[in-house]
Structure formats: structure tokens, C-alpha cells
Amino acid sequence: MKTIDLSRGVPDPRTFPVDSLRAMAASALARDADRMLQYGPAFGYPPLREFIASWFDSAMSNVLVGHGSLELFNFICDAYLQPGDVVFVERPTYDRAITTLRQHGVKIVGIDVGADGICIDAFERELKRHQPKLVYLIPDFQNPTGACMSVDARRAMVRWAREYRFLLVEDGPYGFLRYRGTPLPSLRSMAPDLTLHLSSFTKLISPGVRTGFLVAPEDVVKRVASVAERHYITPSFFAQGIIAAWCEDGRLAPQLDRLKQLYGPRLDTCLQAIEHYLPGRLFVRPDGGFFASLRLGARIDEQSLQAAAREAGLVLSSGRAFFDAQPGYRFLRVPFCALDAADITEGMRRLGDVVDHLNTAARSGKAHATI
């Protein structure tokens, strides 16, 4: 039986632009080898900073380029947080962001996510109880739910950020991967003075380029760059130089179109399979990104789910990892981008069988048995 991996949100290797990267590497080295292969400023490779600034309608002084958006988030935490500070996050949210925040000793306050993203009523209630230093959000096709924050919720975030004087950390790697519908304004476009926008070339080019970036107020960029310099002196100008040449050569827009053409139908296949094999369990209905998600119910034990899934030839991520505290239901993230249509459908069929089996066992009071 073929194993189907539903655990990681990775891109399809067939989308990696190997030939154009090879050509741009040669071109970039021929043009700027001395700078690409030398130490440089912690802010990142200047031509790539210039490209990102133009892309985001900003200034080069508002851009910091590093080894990845998660590392840059860690640097933001180093720069702005002290043990005991309060940080609001969506619940569920990106598991590695939770890990990073815990390593900094902060108090994490989770706010429930629904079909329209973060629940603004719950957010407002928590504001009356806690004063956050930062609010970490993934507004577009959130990891892990796939939810997209409504315009009203975005406006509320900006209004409260001004009123309560906290910074918004907008993690936006999926915003360019909308497969249907109209793009929504980013938090940064609504409040550039309050928003620290993180993104990455990981999902757009490949994880191997290890290049992410921060677009933020100039004073924030300088502060985070100072932290970055303490950690690695200088980022990889070699990788950043290749990406800069690749972007300047007009490769980014066609690559985005290619990703949408491949991943959009896979999302449709995933949603159809969930509706067929796991009816009523879809958490939200995403219009882009890398993930769908499921609400499996409280009676399904995590350990039993993982064991039964392994027997069925499935690899699943832990739903608990995406929560700051144990939820009252079983959650499962479903990545679809790296799987073809047949594996997506078969994976949902097997998962549906696993869930039905576990629910039947729970109702009868039996422990997990072999499927």
C-alpha cells in the first residue's frame, strides 16, 4: 500500500524553476560575483531589497531580507519581547510560531478562528483583559486552517492596534496564492506604520532558496537588522543575488501563474473529496493557499487517530501543535499542494474510513482496534 503524506505543507517539486534559476545564477555571478560572494550588510542584498520595495510599493529602507520568514519572526521577538509580555495569536495558528513564542517566555493568548478568520468579538474581549505587545496574524489562507480574514476584521485589527498601541505581525506567505475570488487588502496596506509584514520565496520559488523578507517601518527594520547581525553577520548574498536576478528578469509573475494553475485544481479536488468522504467536517472553505482543515470532534483521541492513520498508510501532523492550549475538539490540517489528484482523493477516502472507524469504536466504548 502506498503511503500518502498529509503531514507537511510543502510545494510540489515540479514547480521548482530549475532551468531559469540555473541561468540566472550564471548571469548574476557574471555581473556581481564580488558582492554576492562577500560579506555584506545584515539588511540583505541591495538589488533584492530594491525589487521587494518596488513590489510592495515601499522604500528600500523598509525592507530586510534574511534566511526565512520564521527566522525573521524570531529576530522580531528578540528585538521586541521580554519574558512575560503578552502576544495574541489566532487559534489555531502556525505551530512553529507558537514554539518561537514559547522560547521567548511570553504569555500567548489564542483567539478562535472561524470562516472569516479571527473572531473579532473574542479579540475585543481579550483586549479588555490583556495588553498585547504584538499580535501575530496570518490573514490570507491561514496556516493551518486555510481561513481568510474578512475586511471588517482587518479594519478592526488596525483600529485596535492604534488604540491599544500594539504592533501587528502579518505573516503573508500565502497571499499571492489566491485561486479564486478577489484579493483583500493586506494589513500593511492599511497601516504601514503599525505592521511588520513577513513573507518568503519558499512557497513561490522553492524552500531551498532559504530567503524570506520583512517589510516594515524603517526604525523596525534597523532594530531587527541589528539582531540579525548578531546571529549571522550577513545573510546569504549568493542565494539572494540569484533570486534578485531571477525576479528582475521577469520570472516571478509567470511562476505565480504556474503555481495557481497547478494548485487551484488540487484545492478543488481536496474540497470535493472532503465533502464526499468526510461530510460536515470541513473547518473552513479556503480559496487559496496550501491547506484545508478538518474538525473531527472531541471523541476522537489524537493517539488513536495517529495510530489508525499509520495502519491506513497515512502520515498526519499533530493537530494539537497548532494550538496555544488544548482545544475542545480534534483538529487536522490537510496539505494538498504536493499531492496529485489521485493521491488527494485516495487520502481523503482512507481518512474518512479511519474517522468513521474511530467514531464507531468510541460510541461502542472500544479502544482503537486494527482497521
Can you describe what each PLM-predicted range is?
Residues V89, G110, L168-E170, I243, ...:
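Hydrophobic residues in well-ordered beta-strands that form the structural core
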Residues A244, Q261-L271, L282-R295:
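Conserved glycine-rich beta-strand-loop-beta hairpin in the small C-terminal domain of fold type I
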Residues M1-P47, E311-L314, V334:
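N-terminal "arm"/small-domain region of PLP-dependent enzymes with the aminotransferase-like
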Residues R35-R165, G175-L194, Y263, A342, ...:
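Conserved core of the PLP fold type I
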Residues L21, L196-Q261:
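Conserved core segment of the aminotransferase class I/II
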Residues G280-A312:
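Conserved PLP-binding catalytic core of the aspartate aminotransferase-like
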Residues E311, A325-I371:
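PLP-dependent enzyme catalytic core of the Aspartate aminotransferase-like
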